[in-house]
Amino acid sequence: MYGIEYTTVLTFLISLVFVNYILKSVTRTMDFIIYRFLLVIVVLAPLIKAQNYGINLPITGSMDTPYMNSTTSETFLTSTLCLYYPNEAATEIADTKWTETLSQLFLTKGWPTGSVYFKGYADIASFSVEPQLYCDYNIVLMKYDGNLQLDMSELAGLILNEWLCNPMDIMLYYYQQTDEANKWISMGTSCTIKVCPLNTQTLGIGCSTTDINSFETVANAEKLAITDVVDGVNHKLDVTTSTCTIRNCKKLGPRENVAVIQVGGPNILDITADPTTAPQTERMMRINWKRWWQVFYTIVDYVNQIVQVMSKRSRSLDSAAFYYRV
């Protein structure tokens, strides 16, 4: 009997010693791993400069997240500037290194080399189809053309404001606009928009819902069309869907990281008369120079003043993001 008790006690003590040994081994192993990991971090820390730069993500729904550099406070050292210009500017300048020259000049104003991007576009119409405003600050140059005043105004209204948009299924539904901030925005290679207002019995007012030829044409073969109809009235629409996409959009407010500079013209285009523009100020300016070199020199000279009336990027705009948030 005593032999059995001694054996039990001995077994218990041996088990206790064994467990203690295992725990110490595990502890030593974990300490080794942790200390090695910390050593690697300490060694690599001086070689790594953490940055939290903005990432160009497609903005959808009502997401509104600012992406900012959080490690330094310099205004321009951590910012990017995009300068959009018509291709005719590069043609007139006829210098393969003209952008490098301007980059060096921007450097004198505090913009590091590589922070300024130059992006050409063919014409107002083509730029309207695929506006890509990815930088923290975006300056769009538009040369004045008396025949394109309305196109220029529509483009300015699009890029100087933010829009929350939803798809429209015009084959199944009628649509109405609720207020002055509610517009229908169409983009594509050729957008022809026709509308037929409806009464409470869904009968056409001055048109027949079964005859699209009786519809009123509000846009004809345009690349960008911002359509405004009578609020609170249902409409049946006809759209060239094979070459155009239409969205039901709500103006949210100004897009403060975009400025438009009009080159030439007797008067600057004024889109502030729109009652949905509040406050009645816009980031639109005018430069009256005949030669493009003078235009760019002026922009370099006053770039910091221009940027001061803007706010750093909070949203990106591209053709994919347009369909939900513009």
Curated annotation (Swiss-Prot):
Residues noted as binding Ca(2+) 2 in the record, renumbered to the chain: 177, 228-229, 231, 301
InterPro entries linked to this entry: VP7, VP7_1, VP7_2
Modified how: N-glycosylated. The N-terminus is blocked possibly by pyroglutamic acid.
Region called LVD motif, residue ranges: 237-239
One Pfam family linked to the record: VP7
Compartmental location: Virion; Host endoplasmic reticulum lumen
Annotated positions binding Ca(2+) 1: 95, 206, 214, 216
Known glycosylation sites: 69
Main location: virion
Cystines in this chain: 82-135, 165-249, 191-244, 196-207
Start and end residues of each stretch annotated as CNP motif: 165-167
GO molecular function, one term: metal ion binding
Gene3D superfamilies in the record: Glycoprotein VP7, domain 1, Rotavirus outer-layer protein VP7, domain 2
GO cellular component, one term: T=13 icosahedral viral capsid
Region (GPR motif) residue spans: 253-255
Source organism, top-level taxon: Viruses
Keyword terms of this UniProt record: Calcium, Capsid protein, Disulfide bond, Glycoprotein, Host endoplasmic reticulum, Host-virus interaction, Metal-binding, Outer capsid protein, Signal, T=13 icosahedral capsid protein, Virion
Signal peptide start and end residues: 1-50
Subunit and interaction comment: Homotrimer; disulfide-linked. 2 Ca(2+) ions bound at each subunit interface in the trimer hold the trimer together. Interacts with the intermediate capsid protein VP6. Interacts with the outer capsid protein VP5*.
More about this protein: Some rotavirus strains are neuraminidase-sensitive and require sialic acid to attach to the cell surface. Some rotavirus strains are integrin-dependent. Some rotavirus strains depend on ganglioside for their entry into the host cell. Hsp70 also seems to be involved in the entry of some strains.
Family: Belongs to the rotavirus VP7 family.
Function noted in UniProt: Calcium-binding protein that interacts with rotavirus cell receptors once the initial attachment by VP4 has been achieved. Rotavirus attachment and entry into the host cell probably involves multiple sequential contacts between the outer capsid proteins VP4 and VP7, and the cell receptors. Following entry into the host cell, low intracellular or intravesicular Ca(2+) concentration probably causes the calcium-stabilized VP7 trimers to dissociate from the virion. This step is probably necessary for the membrane-disrupting entry step and the release of VP4, which is locked onto the virion by VP7.
Name recorded for this polypeptide: Outer capsid glycoprotein VP7
Organism whose genome encodes this protein: Rotavirus A (strain RVA/Pig/United States/OSU/1977/G5P9[7])
Lineage: Viruses, Riboviria, Orthornavirae, Duplornaviricota, Resentoviricetes
